[in-house]
Amino acid sequence: MAASVGRDERLRLFLAIRLPEPAVEALAGWQARELHGRVVPPENLHVTLAFLGSRPAGELPVILGVLERAAADAAPLRLDVTGYRESRSVGMLTLADEAGATAALAERLHAELEQLGVYRREARRWLPHVTVLRFRERPRLRPEPPSLGWMSSDAAAFLSRLHPPSPAATAARYEVLDSFRLGG
């Protein structure tokens, strides 16, 4: 845990699969060619497994324990880009989840964290994706998705710090609090 964080402080947390550097570089190049607006910076690209929201810092050891055990029991994950779609506020690349392994990892985290009272399941179905663009007004882009796939070998707990967005900057900065190798 960051040294400057007190036990009673609230942390905006999420658990995610980190992308390998070659995939991050390829996606950043694709974003520069195909997207316009507030693109997600390369250092913020990830596949969210569980968004926990604002949690007391004292819960972090329990959350990290759940992530560590789940990651140890999972194998490295094969993810492939299948398309681009937009929701009300984000553009995302959807991913094929080989053999449902990523969905199984997400489901395990959701169930265990929910049982511990540190997570509330979202109403919508979990979808493996990488958020690549944020917007206030849906641009209705139709970019050709990149032909890209990768193996991801670790999962991490992230701290999300919100800042007012500017035309050149994203509204959030993410900090890895801890990461765990998939398969131990």
Q: Where are the regions a protein language model picked out?
A:
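Histidine-dependent nucleotide/RNA phosphoesterase domain, centered on the 2H-phosphoesterase fold
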Residues: 1-184
